[in-house]
A protein has these predicted regions:
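RNase H-like DDE/DDD metal-dependent nuclease/strand-transfer catalytic core used by mobile genetic elements
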Residues: 1-3, 9-121, 210-211, 215
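Hydrophobic alpha-helical segments, especially N-terminal targeting/anchoring helices
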Residues: 7-8, 193
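C-terminal, beta-rich DNA-binding module of retroviral/retroelements integrases
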Residues: 123-220
Length: 220
């Protein structure tokens, strides 16, 4: 069983601890949809580079951060093999495992009860040195950004050239056919010329890549 955790960075408030059978997209999204509806949308989410957060697609896109981008949520990835960049989260995760997972509960329902109990105590009973020996629940403030009923279409500046990604994840641009990502099939992207023949490719406000139209090559 995988534990899916969501934590407010500044207050240490633990938004969710859910036991999932895998790191697959569907389970992670279901947890996040619930969290976003209850607590509002964050401005940015920090994560490691594992599934379901990062893939080998352009800009490391995954189904999850495509959805975040559509919601106007930024994605801050720590550097590969640098868990110290997410130190407080890693420490909390170790504490969670020590107190709830070893030994494991008899079944998934019992394990979730342990997770729920840990979250309640962590948020409302335990003082934390990093926040002045206060509890996370005493400092937490709900986000004012609400989960939208439907996703908004991207709006690009007027000087951008707009294209729709084709069914096979390809982009046809100036007599060149370039592969972007199957994760973007049907999505509208914006191209902004930043130098002679050099273009920035955007998905909403996310920079996907730079394109040199002379060579047809994409770069980070």
């Amino acid at each position: 069983m995988w534990g899916h955790l969501a934590v407010m960075w500044h207050t240490r408030f633990l938004l969710a601890v859910d036991g999932l059978s895998s790191t697959a997209y569907a389970g992670a999204r279901a947890v996040m949809e619930r969290v976003f509806r209850e607590y509002g949308l964050p401005t940015v989410i920090r994560s490691d580079n594992g599934g379901p957060f990062v893939t080998k697609a352009v800009a490391g896109l995954s189904r999850l951060n495509v959805w975040w981008t559509q919601l106007g949520i930024g994605h801050d990835r720590i550097a590969p093999s640098r868990p110290d960049q997410n130190g407080s989260h890693e420490r909390m995760h170790r504490t969670l495992k020590a107190e709830t997972v070893w030994p494991p509960a008899a079944n998934a329902e019992a394990q979730q009860e342990r997770f729920d109990g840990f979250r309640s105590e962590f948020d409302f009973e335990r003082p934390h040195q990093a926040i002045g020996m206060k509890t996370p629940g005493s400092l937490y403030v709900r986000s004012a950004r609400e989960m939208p009923a439907r996703l908004q279409e991207p709006v690009y500046p007027g000087h951008c050239v707009i294209y729709q990604v084709r069914r096979n994840g390809m982009l046809h641009f100036k007599n060149r056919t370039l592969f972007l990502s199957e994760l973007l099939i049907g999505q509208r992207i914006g191209l902004e010329e930043i130098a002679d023949g050099v273009w920035s490719i955007y998905f909403y406000n996310l920079l996907l890549a730079r394109l040199d139209e002379r060579t047809g090559k994409l770069s980070a």
